[in-house]
Amino acid sequence: MLWENKLYQEDLGETYEYLKSILGERKSILVTGVTGLIGSYLIDLLVYYNRNSNRKIKVYAMARNEKKIQERFSHICKNDDVHFIYQDLSEPIQCEDTVEWIVHLASNADPKTYAQFPISTILMNIEGTNYILEYAKNRGAKVLFASTMEVY
């Protein structure tokens, strides 16, 4: 399991030092696309932060595939600081809690899907991002949007 890898833990430790300086007094964060490379690392980093810091951040981790979440995050599925949301972004956000910060990493970035269905792929990514922005606007949250080079 990646979480138990010594090198991975060392990397989390180094990134943790940087994270302490940028989190400030934030108390809650929603991360979308948590089964992707960047999103899964960010969730592990926030869990590491909560385990090693004297303050706790409430983490909301969102992805559409419950099975992938359970496989990737089996080490934290029962962690009280992490709340998993199983949702596709083709619908409005189903998180009633207020979050201060949203890191939006979810998108349909599969080249094969884009090649077959370019318009619907683009529209789905736009619609998902719009739902994130609406949710943020209604709750006064800040949004950080990042993606791979494969987003359309």
Task: Describe each PLM feature range.
Residues 104, 130-152:
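Conserved Rossmann-fold NAD(P)-dependent oxidoreductase catalytic core, especially the SDR/UDP-sugar
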Residues 86-124, 135:
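NAD(P)H-binding glycine-rich loop region in Rossmannoid oxidoreductase-like domains
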Residues 67-81:
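Short, conserved SAM-binding/catalytic segment
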Residues 28-48:
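N-terminal Rossmann NAD(P)H-binding glycine-rich loop of SDR-like oxidoreductase domains
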Residues 1-30:
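Non-catalytic terminal and boundary segments that flank Rossmann-like NAD(P)-dependent oxidoreductase
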